[in-house]
Amino acid sequence: MDQQQQGDKNLTVFVGPWGGNGGTTWDDGIYDGVREIRLVYDHCIDSISVIYDKNGKPAKSEKHGGVGGNKTSEIKLQYPEEYLTGVSGYYCPMVNSGTPVIRSMTFKSNKQVYGPYGVEQGTPFTFSVNGGRIVGMNGRSGWYLDSIGFHLSRPKSTKMINKLRKKIHWLTRIVA
């Protein structure tokens, strides 16, 4: 892991996963943000793929999940002005003896709400980031999206301090 990746990792936190333990583990890693999300779904979330931003360029993830589902939705954020700040959804088994899968997802940005996609049935989950953003996803998938977790950036206090300094400087010029 290079110094940039280590620095990025130190500025992020992980939340989740929500869902079941079927399928195989995946982790897209840590990026600068999310540009687009593509969901295929019907009675559950069949698959998810994401286009992240890495140093100002798009970086496409693999598709996580199966080939089912007859509805497709593409969420195109107005990145970098718009970014993901929260996700909610539901998970439960598709059949009585099966393991839980993600049944529904709703995405919240700093500008609007996208969804819900899928069926809002089962155990609910929700989280939101106060001052940060979603910068990566991970989970488990097989025939469906079995579970989902997120890498979140922490608020960068230096940016906030610099903004405050500029505002204070501007105010002192007006008062003087």
Curated annotation (Swiss-Prot):
Gene responsible for this protein: JAL19
Family: Belongs to the jacalin lectin family.
Protein name per UniProt: Jacalin-related lectin 19
InterPro entries from the UniProt entry: Jacalin-like_lectin_dom (IPR001229), Jacalin-like_lectin_dom_plant (IPR033734), Jacalin-like_lectin_dom_sf (IPR036404)
Source taxonomy: Eukaryota, Viridiplantae, Streptophyta, Embryophyta, Tracheophyta
Molecular function, one GO term: carbohydrate binding
The keyword rRNA processing appears for this protein: no
PANTHER family: JACALIN-RELATED LECTIN 19, JACALIN-RELATED LECTIN 3
Keywords noted in UniProt: Lectin
Record PROSITE patterns: JACALIN_LECTIN
Pfam families linked to this entry: Jacalin (PF01419)
Domain spans labelled Jacalin-type lectin: 12-154
Organism, scientific name: Arabidopsis thaliana
